[in-house]
């Protein structure tokens, strides 16, 4: 499980664990929870353009965060940022092979939502059992700003645990 950039890390660690086959036993992974993942890319999406001046997550801030965190010389189409590029996109089928479920959360006021939905679509195309939780109008990280609004995350956790049993 991961929130924001932690969701990106959870996806990458999950895929690496899936590649390990049975070498991680007795550890049993049942699924991944990607809470408002921090995906990006070089080409601007409609949501990024529409919400470029978002008060919580303006596009200049996301660009700067990626510039500071990606490997030297990499752009925002690096697989750490854009999971639809590189090895990650081809590896999503491993999640299905392992029988894992994936739960995602997103919100309509998030400039990153188009990329989140793109990854959800790719997972569904690979046959992965996906539970997608969506809140209209809220911004990226809204539940951190107002913890009383963390219900979406709690529902996602509950549903993922319930499905994975």
Show where each model-derived region lies:
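Alpha/beta-hydrolase superfamily serine-hydrolase fold, recognizing
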Residues: 1-165
């Amino acid at each position: 499980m991961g929130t924001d950039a932690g969701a990106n890390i959870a996806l990458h660690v999950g895929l690496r664990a899936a590649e390990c086959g049975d070498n991680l036993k007795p550890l049993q992974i049942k699924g991944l929870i990607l809470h408002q993942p921090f995906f990006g890319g070089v080409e601007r999406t409609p949501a990024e353009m529409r919400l470029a001046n978002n008060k919580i997550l303006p596009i200049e801030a996301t660009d700067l965060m990626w510039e500071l965190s990606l490997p030297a010389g990499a752009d925002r189409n690096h697989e750490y940022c854009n999971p639809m590029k590189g090895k990650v996109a081809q590896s999503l089928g491993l999640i299905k092979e392992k029988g894992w479920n994936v739960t995602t959360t997103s919100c309509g006021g998030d400039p990153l939502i188009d990329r989140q939905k793109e990854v959800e679509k790719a997972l569904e195309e690979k046959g992965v059992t996906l539970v997608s939780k969506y809140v209209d109008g809220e911004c990226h990280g809204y539940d951190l700003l107002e913890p009383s609004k963390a219900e979406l995350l709690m529902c996602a956790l509950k549903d993922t645990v319930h499905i994975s049993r």
